[in-house]
Swiss-Prot record:
Function: Catalyzes the conversion of divinyl chlorophyllide to monovinyl chlorophyllide. Reduces the 8-vinyl group of the tetrapyrrole to an ethyl group using NADPH as the reductant. The best substrate is (3,8-divinyl)-chlorophyllide a (DV-Chlidea). Very low activity with (3,8-divinyl)-protochlorophyllide a (DV-Pchlidea) and (3,8-divinyl)-magnesium-protoporphyrin IX monomethyl ester (DV-MPE). No activity with (3,8-divinyl)-magnesium-protoporphyrin IX (DV-Mg-Proto) and (3,8-divinyl)-chlorophyll a (DV-Chla).
Metabolic or biological pathway: Porphyrin-containing compound metabolism; chlorophyll biosynthesis
CDD domains: SDR_a5
Gene Ontology CC terms: chloroplast
Key words, A-Z: Chlorophyll biosynthesis, Chloroplast, NADP, Oxidoreductase, Plastid, Transit peptide
Reported temperature dependence: Optimum temperature is 25 degrees Celsius with DV-Chlidea as substrate, Optimum temperature is 20 degrees Celsius with DV-Pchlidea or DV-MPE as substrate.
Gene Ontology terms for molecular function: 3,8-divinyl protochlorophyllide a 8-vinyl-reductase (NADPH) activity
Protein's name according to its UniProt entry: Divinyl chlorophyllide a 8-vinyl-reductase, chloroplastic
Organism, as annotated: Cucumis sativus (Cucumber)
Span of chain positions assigned to the transit peptide in the UniProt entry: 1-71
Catalytic activity: protochlorophyllide a + NADP(+) = 3,8-divinyl protochlorophyllide a + NADPH + H(+)
EC class: oxidoreductase
Keyword Chloroplast carried by entry: yes
Keyword Cell wall biogenesis/degradation: no
Protein backbone atom coordinates (compact mmCIF):
# COMPACT_ATOMS: atom_id res chain seq x y z
CA UNK A 1 0.00 0.00 0.00
CA UNK A 2 1.41 3.38 -0.93
CA UNK A 3 1.11 6.48 1.21
CA UNK A 4 0.81 9.86 -0.48
CA UNK A 5 0.56 13.26 1.12
CA UNK A 6 -0.44 16.60 -0.33
CA UNK A 7 2.26 19.15 0.32
CA UNK A 8 1.44 21.55 3.11
CA UNK A 9 -2.09 20.25 3.51
CA UNK A 10 -1.45 18.01 6.48
CA UNK A 11 -3.61 15.31 4.88
CA UNK A 12 -2.54 11.70 4.37
CA UNK A 13 -4.22 9.63 1.69
CA UNK A 14 -3.98 5.86 1.43
CA UNK A 15 -4.50 4.50 -2.04
CA UNK A 16 -7.10 1.71 -2.21
CA UNK A 17 -6.09 -1.81 -3.07
CA UNK A 18 -7.51 -1.50 -6.56
CA UNK A 19 -5.71 1.74 -7.35
CA UNK A 20 -4.10 1.81 -10.77
CA UNK A 21 -0.47 2.70 -11.37
CA UNK A 22 -1.47 5.99 -12.92
CA UNK A 23 -3.57 6.78 -9.84
CA UNK A 24 -0.68 5.99 -7.53
CA UNK A 25 1.56 8.30 -9.54
CA UNK A 26 -0.94 11.10 -10.09
CA UNK A 27 0.84 14.44 -10.38
CA UNK A 28 -1.67 15.86 -7.89
CA UNK A 29 0.17 14.12 -5.09
CA UNK A 30 3.74 13.79 -3.95
CA UNK A 31 4.85 10.30 -3.00
CA UNK A 32 7.10 10.59 0.01
CA UNK A 33 9.14 7.61 1.11
CA UNK A 34 11.32 8.14 4.19
CA UNK A 35 14.56 6.21 4.27
CA UNK A 36 17.21 5.68 6.87
CA UNK A 37 20.75 6.84 6.26
CA UNK A 38 23.75 4.55 6.19
CA UNK A 39 27.42 5.25 6.44
CA UNK A 40 29.42 5.02 3.23
CA UNK A 41 33.16 4.75 2.97
CA UNK A 42 35.72 4.48 0.21
CA UNK A 43 39.39 3.79 0.09
CA UNK A 44 41.37 5.78 -2.40
CA UNK A 45 44.94 6.38 -3.39
CA UNK A 46 46.82 9.59 -3.93
CA UNK A 47 46.45 11.19 -7.33
CA UNK A 48 49.17 12.50 -9.58
CA UNK A 49 48.31 14.65 -12.56
CA UNK A 50 50.87 12.94 -14.76
CA UNK A 51 49.76 9.36 -14.18
CA UNK A 52 46.66 7.25 -13.78
CA UNK A 53 46.03 6.30 -10.14
CA UNK A 54 45.64 2.70 -9.09
CA UNK A 55 42.67 1.53 -7.13
CA UNK A 56 43.93 -1.91 -6.20
CA UNK A 57 42.62 -1.61 -2.66
CA UNK A 58 39.11 -0.87 -3.78
CA UNK A 59 37.25 -3.68 -5.46
CA UNK A 60 34.58 -2.54 -7.87
CA UNK A 61 31.78 -4.84 -8.78
CA UNK A 62 30.46 -5.00 -12.35
CA UNK A 63 26.88 -4.05 -13.06
CA UNK A 64 24.69 -7.03 -12.26
CA UNK A 65 20.98 -7.14 -12.95
CA UNK A 66 18.81 -9.90 -11.59
CA UNK A 67 17.92 -12.50 -14.19
CA UNK A 68 14.22 -12.12 -13.41
CA UNK A 69 13.16 -8.46 -13.26
CA UNK A 70 10.82 -7.48 -10.43
CA UNK A 71 8.29 -6.27 -12.97
CA UNK A 72 7.64 -7.23 -16.56
CA UNK A 73 9.92 -5.32 -18.92
CA UNK A 74 8.50 -2.90 -21.47
CA UNK A 75 11.57 -3.04 -23.69
CA UNK A 76 9.88 -2.96 -27.06
CA UNK A 77 6.89 -0.83 -26.22
CA UNK A 78 7.65 2.37 -24.32
CA UNK A 79 8.44 4.48 -27.40
CA UNK A 80 4.99 3.65 -28.76
CA UNK A 81 3.25 4.71 -25.56
CA UNK A 82 1.45 7.93 -24.86
CA UNK A 83 3.81 10.12 -22.77
CA UNK A 84 1.36 10.11 -19.85
CA UNK A 85 1.71 6.33 -19.72
CA UNK A 86 5.51 6.43 -19.82
CA UNK A 87 7.21 6.29 -16.41
CA UNK A 88 10.55 8.09 -16.30
CA UNK A 89 12.80 7.81 -13.26
CA UNK A 90 15.03 10.88 -12.79
CA UNK A 91 17.97 10.70 -10.38
CA UNK A 92 19.88 13.85 -9.49
CA UNK A 93 16.56 15.65 -9.83
CA UNK A 94 17.32 18.50 -7.43
CA UNK A 95 20.64 19.41 -9.05
CA UNK A 96 21.28 22.35 -11.35
CA UNK A 97 20.44 20.47 -14.56
CA UNK A 98 18.26 17.74 -13.04
CA UNK A 99 15.68 20.24 -11.84
CA UNK A 100 15.25 21.62 -15.36
CA UNK A 101 15.13 18.11 -16.83
CA UNK A 102 12.25 17.22 -14.51
CA UNK A 103 10.36 20.36 -15.51
CA UNK A 104 10.95 19.68 -19.21
CA UNK A 105 9.79 16.07 -19.00
CA UNK A 106 6.70 17.08 -17.02
CA UNK A 107 5.90 19.76 -19.60
CA UNK A 108 6.04 17.09 -22.32
CA UNK A 109 3.45 15.03 -20.49
CA UNK A 110 5.64 12.23 -19.15
CA UNK A 111 4.93 10.59 -15.81
CA UNK A 112 8.05 11.60 -13.89
CA UNK A 113 9.32 9.95 -10.73
CA UNK A 114 11.96 12.24 -9.22
CA UNK A 115 14.36 10.74 -6.70
CA UNK A 116 15.49 13.27 -4.10
CA UNK A 117 17.35 13.25 -0.82
CA UNK A 118 15.51 14.31 2.31
CA UNK A 119 17.99 17.20 2.54
CA UNK A 120 18.85 18.36 -0.96
CA UNK A 121 20.42 21.33 -2.67
CA UNK A 122 23.75 23.02 -1.96
CA UNK A 123 25.05 21.75 1.40
CA UNK A 124 21.71 20.01 1.98
CA UNK A 125 19.91 23.22 2.88
CA UNK A 126 16.59 22.34 1.18
CA UNK A 127 13.93 20.48 3.16
CA UNK A 128 11.59 17.79 1.83
CA UNK A 129 8.86 20.40 1.43
CA UNK A 130 11.16 22.69 -0.56
CA UNK A 131 12.28 19.81 -2.78
CA UNK A 132 8.66 18.82 -3.41
CA UNK A 133 7.79 22.38 -4.37
CA UNK A 134 10.87 22.62 -6.60
CA UNK A 135 9.83 19.43 -8.43
CA UNK A 136 6.18 20.35 -8.80
CA UNK A 137 4.35 18.15 -11.30
CA UNK A 138 6.58 15.15 -10.64
CA UNK A 139 6.08 12.33 -8.18
CA UNK A 140 8.81 12.90 -5.61
CA UNK A 141 10.34 9.83 -4.01
CA UNK A 142 12.74 10.50 -1.14
CA UNK A 143 15.49 7.93 -1.18
CA UNK A 144 19.27 7.43 -1.27
CA UNK A 145 20.86 6.56 -4.61
CA UNK A 146 24.21 5.88 -2.98
CA UNK A 147 22.79 2.67 -1.46
CA UNK A 148 21.26 0.19 -3.89
CA UNK A 149 19.18 -1.65 -1.28
CA UNK A 150 17.58 1.60 -0.10
CA UNK A 151 16.83 2.74 -3.65
CA UNK A 152 15.33 -0.62 -4.62
CA UNK A 153 13.13 -0.64 -1.51
CA UNK A 154 11.86 2.85 -2.33
CA UNK A 155 11.00 1.84 -5.91
CA UNK A 156 9.47 -1.39 -4.65
CA UNK A 157 7.19 0.59 -2.35
CA UNK A 158 6.06 2.64 -5.35
CA UNK A 159 5.14 -0.63 -7.09
CA UNK A 160 5.16 0.72 -10.64
CA UNK A 161 7.25 -0.28 -13.68
CA UNK A 162 9.98 2.03 -14.96
CA UNK A 163 10.37 2.64 -18.69
CA UNK A 164 13.33 5.03 -18.78
CA UNK A 165 15.99 6.18 -16.32
CA UNK A 166 17.51 9.65 -16.70
CA UNK A 167 20.61 10.24 -14.58
CA UNK A 168 21.70 13.81 -13.85
CA UNK A 169 23.92 12.74 -10.96
CA UNK A 170 27.27 14.47 -10.53
CA UNK A 171 29.76 14.89 -7.74
CA UNK A 172 29.31 18.27 -6.08
CA UNK A 173 32.96 18.67 -5.17
CA UNK A 174 34.97 16.61 -7.65
CA UNK A 175 36.87 15.15 -4.70
CA UNK A 176 38.32 11.66 -5.09
CA UNK A 177 35.96 9.72 -2.82
CA UNK A 178 32.94 11.82 -3.76
CA UNK A 179 33.57 11.26 -7.47
CA UNK A 180 33.56 7.48 -7.14
CA UNK A 181 30.62 7.53 -4.73
CA UNK A 182 28.38 9.60 -7.03
CA UNK A 183 29.68 9.61 -10.62
CA UNK A 184 30.21 5.85 -10.57
CA UNK A 185 28.58 3.98 -7.67
CA UNK A 186 25.34 5.96 -7.29
CA UNK A 187 24.88 6.19 -11.05
CA UNK A 188 25.42 2.44 -11.32
CA UNK A 189 22.83 1.89 -8.58
CA UNK A 190 20.25 3.86 -10.56
CA UNK A 191 20.93 1.68 -13.60
CA UNK A 192 20.60 -1.58 -11.69
CA UNK A 193 17.48 -0.50 -9.80
CA UNK A 194 15.87 0.90 -12.94
CA UNK A 195 16.49 -2.22 -15.00
CA UNK A 196 15.17 -4.40 -12.21
CA UNK A 197 11.93 -2.40 -12.50
CA UNK A 198 11.79 -2.93 -16.27
CA UNK A 199 13.69 0.08 -17.65
CA UNK A 200 14.86 -0.45 -21.21
CA UNK A 201 16.53 2.91 -21.88
CA UNK A 202 19.05 4.94 -19.87
CA UNK A 203 19.89 8.59 -20.54
CA UNK A 204 23.15 9.64 -18.91
CA UNK A 205 24.25 13.22 -18.34
CA UNK A 206 28.04 13.00 -18.58
CA UNK A 207 30.55 15.73 -19.55
CA UNK A 208 32.53 16.60 -22.67
CA UNK A 209 35.75 16.84 -20.65
CA UNK A 210 35.91 13.04 -20.20
CA UNK A 211 37.56 12.97 -23.64
CA UNK A 212 40.83 13.87 -21.90
CA UNK A 213 40.61 12.20 -18.49
CA UNK A 214 43.17 13.72 -16.13
CA UNK A 215 40.82 14.09 -13.15
CA UNK A 216 39.21 11.58 -10.84
CA UNK A 217 35.60 12.46 -11.59
CA UNK A 218 36.33 12.03 -15.30
CA UNK A 219 37.68 8.53 -14.72
CA UNK A 220 34.65 7.65 -12.61
CA UNK A 221 32.28 8.88 -15.32
CA UNK A 222 34.16 6.98 -18.02
CA UNK A 223 34.06 3.75 -16.03
CA UNK A 224 30.29 3.97 -15.79
CA UNK A 225 29.95 4.95 -19.46
CA UNK A 226 31.89 1.81 -20.42
CA UNK A 227 29.70 -0.42 -18.26
CA UNK A 228 26.55 1.19 -19.62
CA UNK A 229 27.67 0.49 -23.19
CA UNK A 230 28.54 -3.08 -22.25
CA UNK A 231 25.08 -3.58 -20.75
CA UNK A 232 23.50 -2.52 -24.05
CA UNK A 233 25.86 -4.75 -26.00
CA UNK A 234 24.84 -7.78 -23.93
CA UNK A 235 21.09 -7.04 -24.11
CA UNK A 236 19.68 -6.04 -27.49
CA UNK A 237 16.49 -4.86 -25.81
CA UNK A 238 18.32 -2.28 -23.70
CA UNK A 239 19.55 1.06 -25.06
CA UNK A 240 21.31 4.20 -23.86
CA UNK A 241 22.03 7.82 -24.75
CA UNK A 242 25.16 9.43 -23.29
CA UNK A 243 24.97 13.24 -23.30
CA UNK A 244 28.28 15.11 -23.01
CA UNK A 245 27.59 18.85 -22.69
CA UNK A 246 30.12 21.66 -22.83
CA UNK A 247 30.29 24.41 -20.19
CA UNK A 248 27.14 25.49 -18.36
CA UNK A 249 26.19 29.16 -18.17
CA UNK A 250 26.47 29.27 -14.38
CA UNK A 251 30.08 28.08 -14.47
CA UNK A 252 30.93 31.19 -16.51
CA UNK A 253 28.91 33.62 -14.42
CA UNK A 254 30.99 33.69 -11.27
CA UNK A 255 32.63 37.03 -12.10
CA UNK A 256 29.59 38.97 -13.29
CA UNK A 257 28.86 40.65 -9.95
CA UNK A 258 32.55 41.34 -9.32
CA UNK A 259 32.99 43.08 -12.67
CA UNK A 260 29.74 44.96 -12.14
CA UNK A 261 31.20 46.27 -8.87
CA UNK A 262 34.31 47.55 -10.66
CA UNK A 263 36.66 44.61 -10.17
CA UNK A 264 38.82 43.35 -13.06
CA UNK A 265 37.93 40.23 -15.03
CA UNK A 266 40.36 37.48 -14.03
CA UNK A 267 41.68 35.07 -16.64
CA UNK A 268 44.63 32.74 -17.04
CA UNK A 269 47.42 33.36 -19.52
CA UNK A 270 46.35 35.56 -22.40
CA UNK A 271 42.70 34.56 -22.04
CA UNK A 272 42.92 32.36 -25.13
CA UNK A 273 44.13 29.11 -23.59
CA UNK A 274 40.71 27.50 -23.89
CA UNK A 275 37.26 27.98 -25.42
CA UNK A 276 33.77 26.57 -25.08
CA UNK A 277 30.28 26.70 -26.60
CA UNK A 278 28.28 27.21 -23.39
CA UNK A 279 24.76 25.85 -23.15
CA UNK A 280 21.88 26.99 -20.95
CA UNK A 281 20.24 24.70 -18.43
CA UNK A 282 16.93 24.92 -20.30
CA UNK A 283 18.42 24.07 -23.69
CA UNK A 284 20.36 21.15 -22.22
CA UNK A 285 17.26 19.88 -20.44
CA UNK A 286 15.38 20.00 -23.74
CA UNK A 287 18.12 18.00 -25.47
CA UNK A 288 18.14 15.40 -22.70
CA UNK A 289 14.36 15.08 -22.96
CA UNK A 290 14.73 14.55 -26.72
CA UNK A 291 16.92 11.54 -25.92
CA UNK A 292 14.00 9.73 -24.30
CA UNK A 293 12.15 9.05 -27.55
CA UNK A 294 14.46 10.04 -30.42
CA UNK A 295 15.60 6.85 -32.12
CA UNK A 296 18.52 8.65 -33.79
CA UNK A 297 20.00 9.17 -30.32
CA UNK A 298 19.88 5.49 -29.32
CA UNK A 299 23.22 3.93 -28.33
CA UNK A 300 25.04 7.17 -29.10
CA UNK A 301 27.59 9.35 -27.33
CA UNK A 302 26.23 12.84 -27.89
CA UNK A 303 28.53 15.84 -27.36
CA UNK A 304 26.49 19.02 -27.32
CA UNK A 305 27.08 22.75 -27.00
CA UNK A 306 24.99 25.87 -27.15
CA UNK A 307 24.34 28.12 -30.17
CA UNK A 308 26.88 30.45 -31.72
CA UNK A 309 30.66 30.48 -31.94
CA UNK A 310 33.07 29.11 -29.37
CA UNK A 311 34.13 31.74 -26.85
CA UNK A 312 37.46 32.16 -25.08
CA UNK A 313 37.62 33.70 -21.57
CA UNK A 314 38.91 36.88 -23.22
CA UNK A 315 35.82 37.05 -25.44
CA UNK A 316 33.53 36.26 -22.51
CA UNK A 317 35.02 39.17 -20.58
CA UNK A 318 34.67 41.50 -23.56
CA UNK A 319 30.96 40.64 -23.80
CA UNK A 320 30.51 41.45 -20.13
CA UNK A 321 32.29 44.81 -20.32
CA UNK A 322 30.32 45.75 -23.43
CA UNK A 323 27.03 45.03 -21.66
CA UNK A 324 28.16 47.17 -18.72
CA UNK A 325 29.36 49.98 -20.99
CA UNK A 326 32.80 49.84 -19.35
CA UNK A 327 36.33 49.80 -20.69
CA UNK A 328 37.76 46.26 -20.54
CA UNK A 329 39.85 45.68 -17.43
CA UNK A 330 41.54 42.28 -17.32
CA UNK A 331 43.77 40.72 -14.69
CA UNK A 332 45.94 38.02 -16.26
CA UNK A 333 47.20 35.21 -14.04
CA UNK A 334 50.16 33.13 -15.29
CA UNK A 335 49.08 29.49 -15.59
CA UNK A 336 52.43 28.52 -14.08
CA UNK A 337 51.19 29.70 -10.68
CA UNK A 338 48.65 26.91 -10.68
CA UNK A 339 51.28 24.37 -11.70
CA UNK A 340 53.45 25.47 -8.78
CA UNK A 341 50.55 25.24 -6.32
CA UNK A 342 49.60 21.77 -7.56
CA UNK A 343 53.21 20.63 -7.21
CA UNK A 344 53.29 21.82 -3.60
CA UNK A 345 49.98 20.10 -2.80
CA UNK A 346 51.09 16.86 -4.43
CA UNK A 347 54.23 16.93 -2.29
CA UNK A 348 52.25 17.56 0.90
CA UNK A 349 49.84 14.72 0.13
CA UNK A 350 52.73 12.27 0.55
CA UNK A 351 52.90 13.23 4.22
CA UNK A 352 49.31 14.34 4.80
CA UNK A 353 46.95 12.03 2.84
CA UNK A 354 43.94 13.99 4.06
CA UNK A 355 45.00 16.77 1.67
CA UNK A 356 44.41 14.64 -1.43
CA UNK A 357 41.13 16.39 -2.21
CA UNK A 358 42.77 19.81 -1.93
CA UNK A 359 45.33 18.66 -4.49
CA UNK A 360 42.53 17.36 -6.70
CA UNK A 361 40.67 20.69 -6.53
CA UNK A 362 43.82 22.43 -7.70
CA UNK A 363 44.03 20.08 -10.67
CA UNK A 364 40.36 20.69 -11.47
CA UNK A 365 40.94 24.45 -11.51
CA UNK A 366 44.01 24.05 -13.68
CA UNK A 367 42.16 21.76 -16.10
CA UNK A 368 39.33 24.22 -16.67
CA UNK A 369 41.78 27.11 -17.02
CA UNK A 370 43.64 25.44 -19.89
CA UNK A 371 41.45 22.80 -21.55
CA UNK A 372 38.69 23.66 -24.02
CA UNK A 373 35.19 22.29 -23.57
CA UNK A 374 34.92 21.29 -27.22
CA UNK A 375 35.20 18.14 -29.32
CA UNK A 376 38.72 16.73 -29.18
CA UNK A 377 39.45 15.78 -32.78
CA UNK A 378 41.14 12.35 -32.73
CA UNK A 379 42.76 13.01 -36.11
CA UNK A 380 44.51 16.24 -35.13
CA UNK A 381 44.62 15.93 -31.35
CA UNK A 382 43.24 19.48 -31.20
CA UNK A 383 39.95 20.85 -29.92
CA UNK A 384 37.51 21.70 -32.71
CA UNK A 385 34.73 24.25 -32.41
CA UNK A 386 33.45 23.33 -35.87
CA UNK A 387 32.98 19.68 -34.90
CA UNK A 388 31.18 20.51 -31.66
CA UNK A 389 27.41 20.31 -32.30
CA UNK A 390 25.22 23.26 -31.34
CA UNK A 391 21.72 23.13 -29.89
CA UNK A 392 19.19 25.59 -28.53
CA UNK A 393 18.67 29.32 -28.68
CA UNK A 394 19.95 30.79 -25.40
CA UNK A 395 23.25 32.68 -25.68
CA UNK A 396 25.83 33.54 -23.03
CA UNK A 397 25.27 37.23 -23.75
CA UNK A 398 21.57 36.80 -22.94
CA UNK A 399 22.56 35.07 -19.70
CA UNK A 400 25.02 37.81 -18.70
CA UNK A 401 22.39 40.46 -19.42
CA UNK A 402 19.85 38.66 -17.24
CA UNK A 403 22.31 38.20 -14.37
CA UNK A 404 23.29 41.87 -14.50
CA UNK A 405 19.67 42.87 -13.99
CA UNK A 406 18.42 40.02 -11.78
CA UNK A 407 21.49 38.61 -10.05
CA UNK A 408 22.64 34.98 -9.82
CA UNK A 409 19.56 33.68 -7.99
CA UNK A 410 19.12 30.02 -8.87
CA UNK A 411 22.59 29.92 -10.44
CA UNK A 412 24.63 29.53 -7.24
CA UNK A 413 27.92 27.71 -7.76
CA UNK A 414 28.20 26.28 -4.24
CA UNK A 415 31.26 24.05 -3.92
CA UNK A 416 32.01 24.48 -7.64
CA UNK A 417 32.91 28.13 -7.21
CA UNK A 418 36.38 29.17 -8.38
CA UNK A 419 36.28 32.99 -8.24
Amino acid sequence: MSICSTVGAGLNLHSPANATNSTRLSSNFVHQIPVSSFSFSFQSSSLRLSQTPKFSRQRRNPIVVSSTPVVESTKSSFRAKNPKDTNILVVGSTGYIGNFVVKELVSRGFNVIAIAREKSGIKGRNSKEQASDQLKGANVCFSDVSHLDVLEKSLGDLDVPIDVVVSCLASRTGGIKDSWKIDYEATKNSLVAGRNRGASHFVLLSAICVQKPLLEFQRAKLKFEAELMEAAKEDSGFTYSIVRPTAFFKSLGGQVELVKDGKPYVMFGDGKLCACKPISEQDLASFIADCVLSEDKINQVLPIGGPGKALTPLEQGEILFRLLGKEPNFFKVPIGIMDFAIGVLDFLVKFFPAMEDAAEYGKIGRYYAAESMLILDPETGEYSADKTPSYGKDTLEDFFERVLSEGMAGQELGEQSVF
